């Protein structure tokens, strides 16, 4: 993202000097018009929470937080650190003002200096006074040249193959027993929550690519993982859809590295990849190589690591292998392709397993959670369009850790 900001500043404001801060104390005091710094350098110096960094000793004319939703946790070291930056003008740039709940929005307002007691019950006033919102449609109304080609989104609902269904039912029943045992024992609430989340993780992995679940069991038991010999309807559908468009570049957004490894091993085309382990310089090389690659190339991206801050307009096909917790995460991922500079229609397909006859699908339950978060965001922004940006199967009240427990009927 830092590289992208630097390139955009050079493009639109070439007369401004830019300093990319890398932790060197002398560089922070440069005479540059703009200093760009990663969030990580606001928190790494000093062992104690709240230790100042060289950035805190400067008085800035303006502080701008890109991807500002990163400070949504008020108890985090990052939130406390950015609030201590010295400036009279503060901006937050984000496409996700509400990530999980209304409290996220309150955190952003706190950074801006808006009292919490003023925020509650006054979201419309806050929006009118403090939020400048521009959607892609809004920009097109201002300047027709900024109108993007259409973006078509489809939830591809699939049935599990027989062998997948059998494994998922086993995982589901096992999760029931594990959760029931945890709540019978005198464990702490945090321990019980961890048990529930681990069961959910295993069920999600099982639905995406069963070998990930088997690998996790092997690691936990200290044994060699059982090899998955069955088929995967989700993976076979993904590969078939890619093969149907051999002259178009594709993005595949994944949740886990395990599925990325498998997908990469099965594709017979130029494949590029970004996950959480890929360093900055290699990311840039992967992006540039994908842009210069021949039609048919595929970019596999871990959605948490590359779902924001990338320009990949060369791709016209976007595949999401499983629902994310937050619909905004998926929207940001789609925005890597469907953004200014895109000249062709973009087609997005999200692969979701439907409920089994005897057991609910954790993926469909996550879709329900997406519906709730879309409603909260639309209420904060006073904009019903938010609800329709990503189609969801149904909406529900907020899902808590106990609701996740109830998914397993435990």
Where is each model-derived feature located?
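A conserved SF2-helicase RecA2
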Residues: 325-334, 338-410
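Catalytic acidic motif of RecA-like/P-loop NTPases
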Residues: 40, 69-72, 97, 258, ...
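Inter-lobe coupling linker of SF2 helicases/translocases
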Residues: 36-37, 41, 77-87, 110-216, ...
